[in-house]
From Swiss-Prot:
This is Large ribosomal subunit protein bL27. GO terms for cellular component: cytosolic large ribosomal subunit. Keywords: Ribonucleoprotein, Ribosomal protein. Belongs to the bacterial ribosomal protein bL27 family. The N-terminus is cleaved by ribosomal processing cysteine protease Prp. The keyword Ribonucleoprotein applies. Residues 1-9 form a propeptide. The lineage of its organism: Bacteria, Bacillati, Bacillota, Bacilli, Bacillales. Residues 12-32 are annotated as: Disordered. It comes from Staphylococcus carnosus (strain TM300). Residues 20-32 have a biased composition (Basic and acidic residues). It comes from the Bacteria. GO terms for biological process: translation.
Amino acid sequence: MLKLNLQFFASKKGVSSTKNGRDSESKRLGAKRADGQFVTGGSILFRQRGTKIYAGENVGRGGDDTLFAKIDGVVKFERKGRDKKQVSVYAVAE
């Protein structure tokens, strides 16, 4: 009697793959100047997505919602009502 010993091997090598190993670069959002700090006009005060903090006196809002100083002065973070915050820049009396 004839016995056949058949063994089947993989025709392709098993290649490992992963769904990990990627991450987006941080966007460096948040406060760039502190309360009471002196700033010049055009200085970035706060980088954000959406309006987490609103623009107050002498503060402009850029296309990406970045808040910047319009004049030279002192930064002041304030409450705007019960649940909102704003940042203003006040001129310093010389």
